[in-house]
């Protein structure tokens, strides 16, 4: 299944609008958390080739999913009293429901920019992949790199 091609600016605009409406009743840490992540999204729009920017935005979206669940569950009963409170809570919940889909789209953009997940199979141990680089403790290199100079009659530099 192919993900739809959605512009990052559209994702930011939708979440900014829903966060603004959510801040009518929820303030404080809800606003700081969500607007900080939206600022990371603006950074990702400004630097189109940056894997770090889109990766930070993706990580922030995932973090705000959990933070929004906690924040809404704690303060929902005291906020959703009047019509404005119910509207604001509804927009915050709608934003929360859209965030996993937004994470999938942003992850697709992250992969297009050349990013990888930091949790790979070699996270807990050494990688089994072989690359063109030699490791420092590789047995392919000679034990004494200056031995070849001594065999040719050249003076080897002395260490201090």
Curated annotation (Swiss-Prot):
<dbReference type="GO" id="GO:0030659">
    <property type="term" value="C:cytoplasmic vesicle membrane"/>
</dbReference>
<keyword id="KW-0472">Membrane</keyword>
<feature type="region of interest" description="Disordered">
    <location>
        <begin position="128"/>
        <end position="160"/>
    </location>
</feature>
<feature type="topological domain" description="Cytoplasmic">
    <location>
        <begin position="31"/>
        <end position="53"/>
    </location>
</feature>
<feature type="transmembrane region" description="Helical">
    <location>
        <begin position="54"/>
        <end position="74"/>
    </location>
</feature>
<feature type="topological domain" description="Extracellular">
    <location>
        <begin position="75"/>
        <end position="86"/>
    </location>
</feature>
<dbReference type="GO" id="GO:0008217">
    <property type="term" value="P:regulation of blood pressure"/>
</dbReference>
<comment type="subunit">
    <text>Interacts with RACK1, and with the carboxy-terminal region of AGTR1.</text>
</comment>
<keyword id="KW-0812">Transmembrane</keyword>
<keyword id="KW-0333">Golgi apparatus</keyword>
<feature type="transmembrane region" description="Helical">
    <location>
        <begin position="87"/>
        <end position="107"/>
    </location>
</feature>
<feature type="modified residue" description="Phosphothreonine">
    <location>
        <position position="135"/>
    </location>
</feature>
<keyword id="KW-0597">Phosphoprotein</keyword>
<feature type="compositionally biased region" description="Low complexity">
    <location>
        <begin position="137"/>
        <end position="149"/>
    </location>
</feature>
<protein>
    <recommendedName>
        <fullName>Type-1 angiotensin II receptor-associated protein</fullName>
    </recommendedName>
</protein>
<keyword id="KW-0968">Cytoplasmic vesicle</keyword>
<feature type="transmembrane region" description="Helical">
    <location>
        <begin position="10"/>
        <end position="30"/>
    </location>
</feature>
<keyword id="KW-0256">Endoplasmic reticulum</keyword>
<dbReference type="GO" id="GO:0004945">
    <property type="term" value="F:angiotensin type II receptor activity"/>
</dbReference>
<dbReference type="GO" id="GO:0001666">
    <property type="term" value="P:response to hypoxia"/>
</dbReference>
<dbReference type="InterPro" id="IPR009436">
    <property type="entry name" value="AGTRAP"/>
</dbReference>
<comment type="function">
    <text>Appears to be a negative regulator of type-1 angiotensin II receptor-mediated signaling by regulating receptor internalization as well as mechanism of receptor desensitization such as phosphorylation. May play a role of negative regulator in cardiomyocyte hypertrophy induced by angiotensin II through an inhibition of p38 mitogen-activated protein kinase pathway. Attenuates type-1 angiotensin II receptor growth promoting effect and angiotensin II-induced phosphorylation of protein kinase AKT and of STAT3.</text>
</comment>
<dbReference type="GO" id="GO:0005886">
    <property type="term" value="C:plasma membrane"/>
</dbReference>
<dbReference type="GO" id="GO:0000139">
    <property type="term" value="C:Golgi membrane"/>
</dbReference>
<dbReference type="GO" id="GO:0005938">
    <property type="term" value="C:cell cortex"/>
</dbReference>
<feature type="topological domain" description="Cytoplasmic">
    <location>
        <begin position="108"/>
        <end position="160"/>
    </location>
</feature>
<dbReference type="Pfam" id="PF06396">
    <property type="entry name" value="AGTRAP"/>
</dbReference>
<dbReference type="GO" id="GO:0005789">
    <property type="term" value="C:endoplasmic reticulum membrane"/>
</dbReference>
<keyword id="KW-1133">Transmembrane helix</keyword>
<feature type="region of interest" description="Interaction with AGTR1">
    <location>
        <begin position="110"/>
        <end position="122"/>
    </location>
</feature>
<feature type="modified residue" description="Phosphoserine">
    <location>
        <position position="138"/>
    </location>
</feature>
<feature type="topological domain" description="Extracellular">
    <location>
        <begin position="1"/>
        <end position="9"/>
    </location>
</feature>
<feature type="modified residue" description="Phosphoserine">
    <location>
        <position position="127"/>
    </location>
</feature>
């Amino acid at each position: 299944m192919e993900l739809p091609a959605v512009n990052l600016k559209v994702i930011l605009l939708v979440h900014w609008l829903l966060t603004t409406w959510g801040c009518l009743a929820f303030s404080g840490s809800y606003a700081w958390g969500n607007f900080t992540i939206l600022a990371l999204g603006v950074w990702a729009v400004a630097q189109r080739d940056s894997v770090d920017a889109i990766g930070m935005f993706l990580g922030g979206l995932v973090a705000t999913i959990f933070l929004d669940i906690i924040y809404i569950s704690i303060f929902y009963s005291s906020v959703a009293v009047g019509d404005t409170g119910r509207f604001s809570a509804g927009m915050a919940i709608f934003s929360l429901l859209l965030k996993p889909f937004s994470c999938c789209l942003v992850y697709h953009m992250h992969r297009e920019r050349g990013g990888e997940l930091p949790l790979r199979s070699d996270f807990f141990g050494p990688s089994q992949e072989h690359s063109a680089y030699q490791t420092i403790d590789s047995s392919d290199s000679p034990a004494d790199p200056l031995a070849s100079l001594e065999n040719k009659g050249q003076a080897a530099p002395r260490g201090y």
